[in-house]
């Protein structure tokens, strides 16, 4: 499900599970669900794989295994490109969105996982890790922690020659928008706060819009939050502020239309239809 591309030998070595293959070979129930041919370990069905993962009773079983993998290969990633790609896949917050949104306990287990590996050689100096950690915090509505992670991501990126933090900027925009929406009902909000949210998030979201590696689908997915910001706060705005907000949305729509033309997509099938 997470596309780690590990074969059976990798799993046995990284998790120190020398007995597993024997159990797989002799247990007919395991063989109904798993295949170990050609030194590969596969779940027989992608549907079964997703159900097994998403319905795990104790999410800490998963995070403990992932922590072991990260700590085991953390010292070798610099000389092994394959291991580096594995680390990137494991640390992607998209693996955990289902669990973070499931309940508060699961969310805390996921955040504990990120905390448990933050000081490993790969994670502590990698902007990607801190960006993914921030994204998981945003998913869990833990905005102070997200802000701290983003500051660290920008700091680590600044000392890497030639590193362009385009995706960190996108996550920063997502943080600003989601924090505004989450806090709207519990904090006194002024029209100036709305415009500050609008301008600041837009600046981050489109700062590296033209960078060739920027993931524009993600940029536009984040931009859909403007619709919720507008819905919540439009009654606070005066005529000039309404015009400013709508002008910004029109500019985003124009960029979206250009994106759809370039990719051969349609507005209805685009990442966000505002």
Can you describe what each PLM-predicted range is?
Residues 65-70, 102-120, 143-158, 184-210, ...:
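Alpha-helical repeat scaffolds
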Residues 83, 110, 119-126, 163-172, ...:
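Residues that mark the junctions of alpha-helical repeat units in TPR/alpha-solenoid scaffolds
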Residues 134, 138, 147, 151, ...:
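Long, compositionally biased intrinsically disordered regions
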Residues 86-97, 132-133, 172, 176-179, ...:
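Structural register within alpha-helical repeat arrays
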């Amino acid at each position: 499900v997470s596309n780690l591309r590990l074969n059976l030998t990798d799993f046995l070595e990284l998790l120190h599970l020398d007995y597993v293959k024997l159990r797989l070979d002799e247990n007919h129930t395991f063989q109904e669900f798993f295949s170990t041919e050609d030194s590969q370990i596969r779940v027989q069905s992608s549907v079964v794989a997703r159900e097994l993962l998403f319905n795990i009773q104790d999410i800490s079983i998963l995070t403990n295994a992932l922590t072991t993998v990260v700590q085991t290969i953390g010292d070798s990633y610099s000389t092994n490109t394959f291991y580096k790609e594995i680390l990137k896949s494991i640390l992607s917050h998209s693996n955990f969105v289902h669990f973070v949104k499931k309940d508060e306990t699961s969310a805390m287990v996921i955040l504990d996982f990120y905390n448990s590996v933050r000081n490993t050689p790969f994670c502590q100096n990698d902007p990607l890790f801190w960006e993914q950690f921030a994204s998981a915090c945003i998913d869990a509505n833990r905005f102070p922690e997200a802000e701290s992670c983003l500051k660290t991501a920008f700091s680590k990126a600044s000392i890497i020659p030639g590193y362009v933090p385009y995706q960190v900027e996108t996550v920063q925009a997502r943080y600003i928008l989601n924090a505004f929406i989450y806090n709207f009902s519990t904090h006194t909000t002024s029209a100036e706060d709305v415009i500050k949210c609008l301008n600041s998030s837009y600046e981050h979201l489109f700062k590296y819009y033209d960078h060739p590696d920027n993931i524009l689908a993600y940029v536009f997915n984040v931009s859909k939050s403007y619709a919720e910001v507008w819905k919540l706060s439009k009654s606070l705005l005066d005529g000039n502020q309404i015009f400013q907000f709508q002008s910004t949305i029109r500019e985003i729509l124009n960029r979206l239309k250009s994106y759809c033309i370039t990719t051969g997509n349609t507005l209805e099938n685009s990442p966000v239809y505002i």
